[in-house]
Regions:
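Short, glycine/charged-enriched secondary-structure capping and boundary segments
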Residues: 22-23, 43, 86-89, 124-128, ...
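Hydrophobic aliphatic residues
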Residues: 43-47, 100, 163, 189
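Conserved G1/Walker A P-loop phosphate-binding module
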Residues: 1-83
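Helical mechanochemical/support elements of P-loop NTPase systems and associated helical scaffolds
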Residues: 48, 61, 88-92, 119-122, ...
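Canonical P-loop GTPase G-domain recognition
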Residues: 3-15, 146-199
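Conserved nucleotide-sensing/catalytic segment adjacent to the nucleotide-binding pocket
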Residues: 69-106
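Conserved C-terminal guanine-recognition region of P-loop GTPase G domains, centered on the G4
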Residues: 97-169
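Conserved nucleotide-binding/hydrolysis micro-motifs of P-loop NTPases
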Residues: 58, 71, 78-81, 116-118, ...
């Protein structure tokens, strides 16, 4: 997809603060420091649309962006950072679950994992949420440039087993550095957005 515009719309915490649901939404979810912002920036060809941070747990809001005035990208707060309080962890969980439960314009969740790390309990909880609410999702394994091809194949298989990913479920390897997987992700998004809105 040719990107002609990419704009930050607003940040929100709870459903009453969300922007109007006038466009199909693609949400980006994953643990802290997994590379969500870098993935969004690479997909739209902008360096600083989604703010990146070396401090895990910094993003504590739901950030909405409009792409080409046709799609909304939603950057969900990262989870699983050990140094935040239990109350903050609880708020993050409630914030993300409220979005997944309430947002009828949500078309797909990009479920992001670091290919070098095994799925955490929080990752498994997110998967369970998505399954419970019957939300379509795509696994994207980031930082693929950090491993050799053989290591990538091995780690991908291990992650699939840990997630109990069914045969045929899409898993795309991605690198912000090399842009590996960028076109594959866009192909999935374009195919998905031709489908009717989730009921």
């Amino acid at each position: 997809m040719k990107i002609t515009s990419a704009e930050f719309i607003k940040s929100a915490v709870w459903p009453p603060q969300y922007p109007p649901a006038t466009l199909p939404e693609i949400a980006f979810a994953g643990r802290s420091n997994v590379g969500k912002s870098s993935l969004i920036n690479t997909l739209v060809g902008r360096k600083n649309l989604a703010k990146t941070s070396n401090t895990p747990g910094r993003t504590q809001l739901i950030n909405f962006f409009t792409i080409n005035e046709k799609i909304s990208f939603v950057d969900l707060p990262g989870y699983g950072f050990a140094k935040v309080s239990q109350s903050v962890k609880k708020n993050w969980g409630e914030m993300v679950e409220a979005y997944l439960k309430e947002r009828q314009s949500l078309a797909l969740v990009i479920f992001i994992l670091d290919i070098r790390r095994d799925p955490s309990k929080d990752d498994l909880s997110l998967r369970d949420w998505l399954e419970h609410y019957r939300i379509p999702y795509l696994y994207v394994l980031t930082k693929a440039d950090k491993l050799s091809n053989n290591q990538s194949v091995s780690q991908r298989s291990k992650i699939e087993r840990n997630l109990h990913a069914e045969a045929g479920r899409g898993i795309i390897l991605f690198s912000a550095k090399t842009e590996k997987g960028k076109n594959d992700i866009w192909q999935v998004l374009e195919d998905r957005l031709r489908l009717p809105e989730r009921k």
